[in-house]
Amino acid sequence: LNKTKVKITTIQILDEAGNEDKIELLTEATKEFNGDCFIIDYDESEITQSEGNKTRLKIYKDKLIMIKMGTLSTKMEFEENKNSTNMYTTPYGSFDISFKTIIYDYSLNELGNGSVYIEYKIIFDGAEEALNKIMIDIN
């Protein structure tokens, strides 16, 4: 396991005017390569309102799987032009979350350094809403 620094920026577009909610997390993580993907493990913080949670990113060339464990738990899979539905568990109950990945841009080198960019829309009752962006920088 290698120690690494990870910067994760999440942006949610709030309205038609393009107003956005932006959260940045800079954290220490562990990084390993398991043959077909890089695995990044890190602890969430109060910045992400998920303190005490652990997150694992499994980063493949064509998709990313995000697994959150703790008081909030979910498994989200991002693959370009694919829809996905996952269970999202909170202390207040569980619900299904559906989303469509619009862009998946993998720019990691053979050491697992670089960036991954994802754009996805959360789908509520069959209607696409809430454009979200995730930028992951690993070095």
Label every PLM stretch briefly.
Residues L1-Y117, K121-L131:
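N-terminal intrinsically disordered, cationic/polar leader segments
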Residues M135-N139:
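Flexible glycine-rich active-site/ligand-binding loops centered on an Asp-His dyad
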